[in-house]
Amino acid sequence: MKFETTKNKLHGNAYYQAQFQDPIKFTTGSATPASYNQFIDALRERLTGGLIYGIPVLRDPSTVEKPNQYVTVELSYSDTVSIQLGIDLTNAYVVAYRAGSESFFFRNAPASASTYLFTGTQQYSLPFDGNYDDLEKWAHQSRQRISLGLEALRQGIKFLRSGASDDEEIARTLIVIIQMVAEAARFRYVSKLVVISLSNRAAFQPDPSMLSLENTWEPLSRAVQHTVQDTFPQNVTLINVRQERVVVSSLSHPSVSALALMLFVCNPLNATQSPLLIRSVVEQSKICSSHYEPTVRIGGRDGLCVDVSDNAYNNGNPIILWKCKDQLEVNQLWTLKSDKTIRSKGKCLTTYGYAPGNYVMIYDCSSAVAEATYWDIWDNGTIINPKSGLVLSAESSSMGGTLTVQKNDYRMRQGWRTGNDTSPFVTSIAGFFKLCMEAHGNSMWLDVCDITKEEQQWAVYPDGSIRPVQNTNNCLTCEEHKQGATIVMMGCSNAWASQRWVFKSDGTIYNLYDDMVMDVKSSDPSLKQIILWPYTGNANQMWATLF
């Protein structure tokens, strides 16, 4: 069913710039993994309004003028057959598409969409909204049963360009296009699955992880922007490929690196922000609430938890590492207060002094030296005492070892993750094109991704270590602290800086101490070498967790 909408005549430079900005183009006829990556990167760049905690974020709707609210994407089947999509840059939603001299708008498209998109065409309203619930109802198929891939995209472009009025097929086709364009722009996980599909020349269906990410984009964006001391005020629950729950409680959780674009929710008061978020925009934007004081566990070395020794709260009792208990118990629960104290049962995590090696204890907050009770939790998993510049460290590898403060060397023993689920995050790690990290004895290299292979399963611990599920006593380790050092498997017992990694929002796996990233040597997987190398942004340094 088609309904012609009202077409408005527009004037002004703002309209001209928005309407006639070149569309971002992707040609399916000669598509390669590289050309698809270039397309998605260009779309992400066009949609990005700034960075919050280093993660690209869309524009604040309150700062966007209506004529500048939309971007266009051109998808080509051939030199003569193509369609265009209209995308709302405040939420990355597809709101309309153009097929020749006609254009079609979702029923729930913003009122301004038909005013500023495809104005030289005959405009029609589709009989359904652009959300998955409505699209699946009209398609008579769920997303998980609709195949994605290059051929599905090509046939979808050809079908929409034909002008056929089969609403069921239109809805099904739009489900394909929305996921391969908009969702891929939002999530590295999705774009990586498409790249693997292009490499294999094989169709794929959305897995539980992909669907889970699509369904939780807004809650995950909200949680990141409301982060307090690296901790989400509310957990976000994802589903992995094995249909298991993955509880995400902190900004440093590796699954957060799947986010390539966030929905704008609010500006964190103290977040590191990009210059793109200019002062006048930030001043107009909504500021996140800062009243959250989450109560969480703190997981660290070897997956053990920060614990008040013997559950004794007398002043001076040491803080130790202990096995995380099956139930949430008070001596392993810590409230992250807005005054920068970290409290268990109302008493403060306190450093005995400001020299390396001083032990950390529980102490009455009102009688302790205030500066000894203050801590900052960074988004790389570091917990630092601002007065001394020293960091919380687990020097002993044994359960029951007393925590101390030490010089910040970004060692594995100095890595932490907050949240009530501090268990290791189990995932495959996809890298250069269609290949995944695979463990072999003391070595690691890339092979064709197969989530059923145990060699491709990795456990990412709260301390920042990456361990093969086959043997979690081994850690991915750079052999030397220098450019070109090979990354191998070594025992985790030393908890070195060479064994601590951060999954960054730019798609890299980053070593904090060396300020370098994992790199497929010479972009040649046949060499079977992953090395440490300065950041270049090239495809051989891009990784994604496939959990």
Curated annotation (Swiss-Prot):
Heterotetramer of two A and two B chains. Disulfide bonds join 266-288, 305-324, 348-365, 436-449, 475-492. SMART domains: RICIN. This is Agglutinin-1. 1-alpha repeats lie at residues 302-344. It catalyses: Endohydrolysis of the N-glycosidic bond at one specific adenosine on the 28S rRNA. Glycans are attached at residues 380, 420.
